[in-house]
């Protein structure tokens, strides 16, 4: 027991006895309550600190966003620059430029411009007030010209082409070998051929050969159809030809394949219309790029046509097309090879003899034989069969050859009921 003195006038006895165990319990409970309150306050403090850090991070983020938006706003408020062309570079660092509005000026240039990028004909950006050269603009090419580059190689190789072994060997010698083994030509002391013309009837595999070259070589392959160079406005076709060869030089070693070159390479005549004159301007630019004053570097040209008789003689001379490869109609052995290539994935019956089919398809091109194989498969599907037999091929030959003979007869003036 413990004696506890009580204050006077408290209404209690001056002295009293309180059990020690009850007071200890009171103190322990009080300490426990204070500890729990302390833990809660610490937890609240920790949460407030985390919220403070989060708010500070957001503040930094918002300040960064404000600076970004302010910079973008200032950039958008910047007055536009004038596009001009350099005519001449003077010795004192000044330049003679021609603005897009027409007049010519002698102006200063920024000291941060690389002198190697400054040359007559370069596009530059000019200040609106002083017309000082601020920067040199990159050379812009026509998007249609940039789209001519073949990025994904075709899935055609020389094994997919039948009956053209001699043409394939010539193509390897003139196109592939100079790109893969140029040291051979240096040892012999000759310049490799830079131009190859493939000519022959339609459907004989000229474009297939070009696809195989694109698949085999690691050079940049640029494909264009001749009619794409025929433009509406004067000078547009010549500009596309110039940009086409510039692209080929930048990405050399490269191969330019011009399909249906007869659309722009026809003989030049005296009596012509305004449209013919524009085609002739494009042809002249093509002739200059193929074998003109400026060397074209490690750029090979491959062209195809089925009308070599109408091509301009200047286009066919050595130096432009050094080698002309004829792609003839396939022989019986070649037709059999072509049929085997197209039918190698087909489910054929035992009675199918591709040799006999090759013999009865005289004067058929590779495209005709491909159509015959496809039609034979269609006849089998029509009869609900998964095996192609000889009757399907006979029907396909009759259909394809009959349509071809009918079209040829109509062209010659024969009428059918």
UniProtKB/Swiss-Prot annotation:
Its main location: cytoplasm. It is found in: Cytoplasm. It comes from the Archaea. PROSITE patterns: AAA (PS00674). ATP binds at residues 203-208, 342. SUPFAM superfamilies: P-loop containing nucleoside triphosphate hydrolases (SSF52540). It holds the Pfam family AAA_lid_3. GO terms for biological process: proteasomal protein catabolic process; protein unfolding. GO terms for cellular component: cytoplasm; proteasome-activating nucleotidase complex. Consists of three main regions, an N-terminal coiled-coil domain that may assist in substrate recognition, an interdomain involved in PAN hexamerization, and a C-terminal ATPase domain of the AAA type. ATPase which is responsible for recognizing, binding, unfolding and translocation of substrate proteins into the archaeal 20S proteasome core particle. Is essential for opening the gate of the 20S proteasome via an interaction with its C-terminus, thereby allowing substrate entry and access to the site of proteolysis. Thus, the C-termini of the proteasomal ATPase function like a 'key in a lock' to induce gate opening and therefore regulate proteolysis. Belongs to the AAA ATPase family. This is Proteasome-activating nucleotidase. It comes from Methanocella arvoryzae (strain DSM 22066 / NBRC 105507 / MRE50).
């Amino acid at each position: 027991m413990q004696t506890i003195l009580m204050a006077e006038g408290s209404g209690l006895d001056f002295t009293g006895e309180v059990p020690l165990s009850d007071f200890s319990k009171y103190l322990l409970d009080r300490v426990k309550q204070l500890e729990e309150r302390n833990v809660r306050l610490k937890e609240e403090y920790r949460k407030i600190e985390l919220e403070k850090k989060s708010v500070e991070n957001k503040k930094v983020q918002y300040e960064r966003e404000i600076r970004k938006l302010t910079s973008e706003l200032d950039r958008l408020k910047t007055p536009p620059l004038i596009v001009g062309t350099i005519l001449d570079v003077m010795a004192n660092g000044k330049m003679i430029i021609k603005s897009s509005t027409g007049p010519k000026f002698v102006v200063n240039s920024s000291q941060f411009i690389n002198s190697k990028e400054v040359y007559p004909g370069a596009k530059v950006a000019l200040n609106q007030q002083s017309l000082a050269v601020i920067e040199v603009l990159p050379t812009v090419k026509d998007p249609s010209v940039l789209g001519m580059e073949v990025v994904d190689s075709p899935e055609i190789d020389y094994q997919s082409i039948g009956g053209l072994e001699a043409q394939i060997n010539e193509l390897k010698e003139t196109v592939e070998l100079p790109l893969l083994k140029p040291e051979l030509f240096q040892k012999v002391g000759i310049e490799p051929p830079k131009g190859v013309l493939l000519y022959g009837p339609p459907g004989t595999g000229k474009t297939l050969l070009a696809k195989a070259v694109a698949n085999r070589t690691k050079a940049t392959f640029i494909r264009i159809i001749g009619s794409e160079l025929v433009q509406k406005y004067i000078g547009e076709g010549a500009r596309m030809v110039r940009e086409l060869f510039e692209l080929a030089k930048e990405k050399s070693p490269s191969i330019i394949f011009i399909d249906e070159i007869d659309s722009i390479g026809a003989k030049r005549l005296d009596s012509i219309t305004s449209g013919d004159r524009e085609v002739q301007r494009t042809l002249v630019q093509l002739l200059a790029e193929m074998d003109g004053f400026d060397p074209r570097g490690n750029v090979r040209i491959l062209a195809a046509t089925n009308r070599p008789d109408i091509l301009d003689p200047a286009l066919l001379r050595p130096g432009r097309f050094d080698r002309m490869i004829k792609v003839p109609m396939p022989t019986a052995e070649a037709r059999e090879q072509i049929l085997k290539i197209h039918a190698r994935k087909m489910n054929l019956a035992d009675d199918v003899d591709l040799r006999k089919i090759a013999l009865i398809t005289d004067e058929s091109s590779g495209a005709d034989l491909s159509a015959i194989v496809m039609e034979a498969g269609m006849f089998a599907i029509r009869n609900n069969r998964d095996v192609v037999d000889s009757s399907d091929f006979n029907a396909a030959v009759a259909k394809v050859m009959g349509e071809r003979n009918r079209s040829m007869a109509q062209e010659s003036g024969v009428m059918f009921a």
